[in-house]
Amino acid sequence: MTNYYGHNIVIIGLGITGITCVNFFRSRGITPRVMDTRYNPPQLNQLPKDIQYWLGELKIEWLLAATLIVISPGISLSHPAINTAMKCGIEIIGDVELFLREVTVPVVAITGTNGKSTVAKLVGTMANCAGLKVGVGGNIGYPVLSLLQQSHQLYVLELSSFQLETTKNLKVAVATILNISEDHMDRYPLGLQQYREAKLKIYKQAKIYIINDDDKLTLPANSTNKEYCSIIKFGIKSGHYCLGDYQGKQWLMAYGKPLLDCNEIKIIGRHNLLNALAALALAEAIAIPRQACLIALRQFSGLMHRFELVLERKGIRWINDSKATNVGSTKAALNELTVDGTLHLLLGGDGKLADFSSLQPFVQGNNIHLYCFGKDSKKLAALNQHSATITQTLSQAMHIINNQVKAGDVVLLSPACSSLDQFENFKVRGKTFTNLVFEFNDGNNN
């Protein structure tokens, strides 16, 4: 356990992550100070009464007096006040760094633009099926410091690029970058390579690398240094874990041998088969028995808001892919669809300065109509001007679709954007979609 006695600690951010940091230090007899750029941060009412706090801006005097600053992922290191503190030599870390300083059991670290939560949860399920006491947390929605409240034999962490930026001690058992495509360009003004470099930090001290053989951007610079690391690869057609034909069907393969008929897996889509392969590779790296992995794959039904079939009724499929907060994720969803009638595609939100142009080939044709809402609705509608409807809100778009949809059609919410311009998070956006689906189908569609 790291000793923070005598430190002047400032915590930046009073969301769920920030309040767990406050509780972490309080449990060790340390009273931190807290600040947030928001005037009404979500966890303000959870803050103990004796904790000093500052709202609306970052108080530079507190920062420069600190010996340790713990920053939440939502605050950029490029913020002028943070930059000033860094130049003064003040240590700035995140909650993941605090967590890793405390644990002594193996840690699985997972990042990537898309699929992180699914793979993290799947590896956790595999460990559970093997009888291991496993803690799953991080960017998946469960703060890592909360995992310390119970003892575990293994930790599985989903890590965002923002979390990796503020983590120094990444001595993990195994690490992977599932894929890399453009995302969060509002935080990475130098472009994709800057974003990629943040992701690549996950490999720095890992004992084993799990590499996506289909995505060369995920390849670490020292991957050929055999003395430094061990590598397991996964991919659609190549890698130690890949897809293959066996007895006339598509199977998950391991080292050229058939493992599991893909028809036995509940999660749908080619991208989820790739997620399953990645999970198997990670499980091998930490010696989870193969049989437990196969049981988990047969049981695992996926996570909400991720290419989730909400309802199929009267020949119409309604799919909630609200977690598609970037172009790459929406492209993956569109690759999975076979549509007999018309695809009604809901796009919109805050694109985070993304370039939408690579989405254009996916949204052409006579059997697709775009419904674009939110901050970047006009940019998205320009992808197919002849077949796009612009609305202010998701709800307005859904009501238009409900009056037009017919048997053979698919309604897909896969926004390619963040939800934060109009919703608290992607979950609320997905729930709004789902509620409208059932409202339509329990009412005027029955």
From Swiss-Prot:
One GO process term, biological-process aspect: cell wall organization
Location, primary (coarse class): cytoplasm
Listed EC numbers: 6.3.2.9
Pathway noted in the entry: Cell wall biogenesis; peptidoglycan biosynthesis
Keywords: ATP-binding, Cell cycle, Cell division, Cell shape, Cell wall biogenesis/degradation, Cytoplasm, Ligase, Nucleotide-binding, Peptidoglycan synthesis
Reactions it catalyzes: UDP-N-acetyl-alpha-D-muramoyl-L-alanine + D-glutamate + ATP = UDP-N-acetyl-alpha-D-muramoyl-L-alanyl-D-glutamate + ADP + phosphate + H(+)
Gene Ontology terms: cellular component: cytoplasm
Positions annotated to bind ATP: 112-118
Keyword set includes Glycosyltransferase: no
Protein family (similarity comment): Belongs to the MurCDEF family.
Database matches in InterPro entries: Mur-like_cat_sf, Mur_ligase_C, Mur_ligase_C_dom_sf, Mur_ligase_cen, MurD
Highest taxon above the source species: Bacteria
GO MF term list: ATP binding; UDP-N-acetylmuramoylalanine-D-glutamate ligase activity
Localization per record: Cytoplasm
Pfam families from the UniProt entry: Mur_ligase_C, Mur_ligase_M, MurD-like_N
Organism, scientific name: Baumannia cicadellinicola subsp. Homalodisca coagulata
Protein name: UDP-N-acetylmuramoylalanine--D-glutamate ligase
Function per UniProt: Cell wall formation. Catalyzes the addition of glutamate to the nucleotide precursor UDP-N-acetylmuramoyl-L-alanine (UMA).
